[in-house]
């Protein structure tokens, strides 16, 4: 009888401890995604995309010419890498 009571008490104490640990880690995890997203999407003047006179890879080439190293696909009207079968 005593072993059963002790094992029930230890099981209950283990569940309470597990609940406390999970709650603490969850409250820390709630702040982590916010911090991560704010650092990823932070606006920095050095990394802003600047306007170019040419279109880059997989950009429309109807109005703009493709940048050097790319050709305008006659089928899709996108700037793509030149390949032997596209020349």
From Swiss-Prot:
Tissue expression per record: Expressed by the venom gland.
> Which InterPro entries does the entry mention?
Huwentoxin-1, Huwentoxin_CS1
Q: Which UniProt keywords apply?
A: Disulfide bond, Ion channel impairing toxin, Knottin, Secreted, Signal, Toxin
One GO cellular component term:
extracellular region
Q: Please indicate which superkingdom the organism of origin belongs to.
A: Eukaryota
S-S pairs:
54-67, 61-72, 66-79
Report the leader peptide range: 1-24
Which SUPFAM superfamilies has this protein been placed in? omega toxin-like (SSF57059)
Where it sits in the cell: the answer is: Secreted
Q: What positions belong to the pro-peptide in this record?
A: 25-52
- Output the PROSITE patterns linked to this UniProt entry: HWTX_1 (PS60021)
Task: Give the GO molecular function terms.
Answer: ion channel inhibitor activity; toxin activity
Share the domain note from the entry: The presence of a 'disulfide through disulfide knot' structurally defines this protein as a knottin.
By sequence similarity, the record places it as follows: Belongs to the neurotoxin 10 (Hwtx-1) family. 51 (Hntx-8) subfamily. Hntx-8 sub-subfamily.
The job of this chain, per UniProt, is described as: Ion channel inhibitor.
Q: What is this protein called?
A: U3-theraphotoxin-Hhn1a 10
Q: Which organism is it from?
A: Cyriopagopus hainanus
Organism ancestry: Eukaryota, Metazoa, Ecdysozoa, Arthropoda, Chelicerata
């Amino acid at each position: 009888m005593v072993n059963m009571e002790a094992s029930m008490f230890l099981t209950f104490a283990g569940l309470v401890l597990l609940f406390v640990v999970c709650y603490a880690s969850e409250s820390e995890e709630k702040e982590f995604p916010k911090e991560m997203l704010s650092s990823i999407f932070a606006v920095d003047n050095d990394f802003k995309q600047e306007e170019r006179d040419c279109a880059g890879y997989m950009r429309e080439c109807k109005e703009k010419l493709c940048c050097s190293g790319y050709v305008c696909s006659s089928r899709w009207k996108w700037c793509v890498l030149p390949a032997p079968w596209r020349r």
